[in-house]
């Protein structure tokens, strides 16, 4: 038995300079696990609640001392003495202790920090790398990265309404090479922007955040130019992905693309996306419709779902109840997995498993407010998810995940596999 003998929560800062929760869990053997939780900017309304202090005199009200206090007192009292290797029982204990549907009493940030730290301690106790602890001997598949090279929406202060324009190196032979493809395109894009006199400042997730004359299509065309200049073939070696984060520009039943001067119905917005899919090698569209516009989601899925990965993020918020409803109604064909949307590892793994059983893909994801914690890299490999979304090729909070994946691929050696296009098994 790996009994938990001490838990310490603390307030640290994330990549945006906002407070977040970190937790240390100490086991009887002397082994310790540490984990820190991320935070999002564009959030789904049905996400588990992130507990903030609301004290405007500290960190503009964004302090997390309440959540830390729950870890150091109430949660600590409930889990001391529990076996760290019994993750499902520990997570159930946390859920029952909170007692709310959306984790609003203790806070998903407090609960997740404990859940992750316990898993790290248990893996260390077992003498296993975290990905192997999660997935056993079957954990051999590296994820295809979705790399956010141009930021817009809530992640940048520019004229782009869409939140992320991504490159997806699905033609690479290995994860290491996929990362190289991405880095070389990133640097090619930087030079293109510089030569055009466009800002090369980066946004929250490390992608460039320029005002782009000509809007979204001009931005897509610059990415395609960068792919070509880096020596790769768009569509064959590197595909494109979009995160629309459409809830952020959905107003009164219309999709208000202010940067384009457009106000569109769900049908018109779908037509516009379909036009882009026809013109450009776009293989994935995330949150193409607002989270509450299920009719719009159905239109989008029916129109593009056979050829394009249609990912639900704000739509599903890593919640199995909502995901099941989407599966039953034929909404989307993929789920974005964000551990802090649901608040425990056990519930996270349940959402991944449900998606796979239904033929949906599961894309493991970071948040825009990140830390040096690299747990999601281990989750991506441990669950054989096949895809990961963890930002651009800059900012150490993003690179921490990529570098951990490099280490995992090295550790796996010859048994490591890189799925490439087959990671998109939801497409026909």
Swiss-Prot record:
PROSITE patterns to which the protein is assigned, alphabetical: ENOLASE
Keyword Cytoplasm: yes
Keyword presence, ATP-binding: no
GO molecular function terms listed in the Swiss-Prot or TrEMBL record: magnesium ion binding; phosphopyruvate hydratase activity
Residues of the active site: 205, 338
Reactions that this protein is recorded to catalyse: (2R)-2-phosphoglycerate = phosphoenolpyruvate + H2O
Pathway linked to the protein: Carbohydrate degradation; glycolysis; pyruvate from D-glyceraldehyde 3-phosphate: step 4/5
UniProt keyword list: Cytoplasm, Glycolysis, Lyase, Magnesium, Metal-binding, Secreted
Class of the enzyme per the UniProt entry, highest EC level: lyase
A Pfam family this chain is assigned to: Enolase_C
UniProt xrefs under InterPro entries: Enolase (IPR000941), Enolase-like_C_sf (IPR036849), Enolase-like_N (IPR029017), Enolase_C (IPR020810), Enolase_CS (IPR020809), Enolase_N (IPR020811)
Binding site residues for (2R)-2-phosphoglycerate: 163, 338, 367-368, 389
Location in or out of the cell: Cytoplasm; Secreted; Cell surface
Swiss-Prot/TrEMBL cofactor(s): Mg(2+)
EC numbers for this chain: 4.2.1.11
Gene Ontology cellular-component terms listed: cell surface; extracellular region; phosphopyruvate hydratase complex
Cofactor note: Binds a second Mg(2+) ion via substrate during catalysis.
A GO biological process held by the record: glycolytic process
Positions contributing to Mg(2+) binding: 243, 286, 313
Family membership: Belongs to the enolase family.
Entry function: Catalyzes the reversible conversion of 2-phosphoglycerate (2-PG) into phosphoenolpyruvate (PEP). It is essential for the degradation of carbohydrates via glycolysis.
Matching HAMAP family: Enolase
Protein name: Enolase
Biological source species: Polaromonas naphthalenivorans (strain CJ2)
Organism classification: Bacteria, Pseudomonadati, Pseudomonadota, Betaproteobacteria, Burkholderiales
Gene: eno
């Amino acid at each position: 038995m790996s009994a938990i003998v001490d838990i310490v929560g603390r307030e640290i800062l994330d990549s945006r300079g906002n407070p977040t929760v970190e937790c240390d869990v100490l086991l009887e053997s002397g082994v310790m696990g540490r984990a820190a939780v991320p935070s999002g900017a564009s959030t789904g309304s049905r996400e588990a609640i992130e507990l903030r202090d609301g004290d405007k005199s500290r960190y503009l009200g964004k302090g997390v001392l309440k959540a830390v206090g729950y870890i150091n007192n109430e949660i600590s009292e409930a889990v001391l003495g529990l076996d760290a290797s019994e993750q499902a029982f520990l997570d159930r204990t946390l859920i029952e202790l909170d007692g709310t549907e959306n984790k609003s009493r203790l806070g998903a940030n407090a609960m997740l920090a404990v859940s992750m730290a316990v898993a790290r301690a248990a893996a260390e106790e077992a003498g296993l790398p975290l990905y192997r602890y999660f997935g056993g001997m079957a954990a051999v598949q590296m994820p295809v990265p979705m790399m956010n090279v141009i930021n817009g929406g809530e992640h940048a202060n520019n004229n782009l309404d869409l939140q992320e324009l991504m490159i997806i190196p699905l033609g690479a032979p290995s994860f290491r090479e996929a990362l190289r493809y991405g880095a070389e395109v990133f640097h090619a894009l930087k030079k293109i922007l510089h030569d055009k006199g466009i800002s090369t400042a980066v946004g929250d997730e490390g992608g460039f955040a320029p005002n782009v004359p000509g809007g979204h299509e001009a931005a897509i065309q610059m990415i395609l130019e960068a792919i070509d200049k880096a020596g790769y073939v768009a569509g064959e070696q590197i595909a494109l992905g979009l995160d629309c984060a459409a809830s952020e520009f959905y107003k009164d039943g219309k999709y208000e693309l202010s940067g384009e001067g457009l106000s569109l119905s769900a049908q018109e917005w779908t037509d516009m996306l379909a036009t882009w899919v026809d013109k450009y090698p776009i293989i994935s569209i995330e949150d193409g419709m607002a989270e509450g516009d299920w009719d719009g989601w159905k239109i989008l899925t029916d129109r593009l779902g056979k050829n394009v990965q249609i990912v639900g993020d704000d739509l599903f918020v890593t919640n199995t109840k909502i995901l099941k409803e989407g599966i039953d109604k034929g909404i989307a064909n993929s789920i974005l997995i964000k551990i802090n949307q649901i608040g425990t590892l056990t519930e996270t793994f349940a959402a991944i498993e449900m998606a796979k059983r239904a033929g949906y893909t599961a894309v493991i994801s970071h948040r825009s407010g990140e830390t040096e914690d690299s747990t999601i890299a281990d989750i991506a490999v441990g669950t054989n998810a096949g895809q990961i979304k963890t930002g651009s090729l800059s900012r150490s909070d993003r690179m921490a995940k990529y570098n951990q994946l490099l280490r995992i691929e090295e550790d796996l050696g010859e048994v490591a596999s890189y799925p490439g296009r087959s990671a998109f098994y939801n497409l026909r």
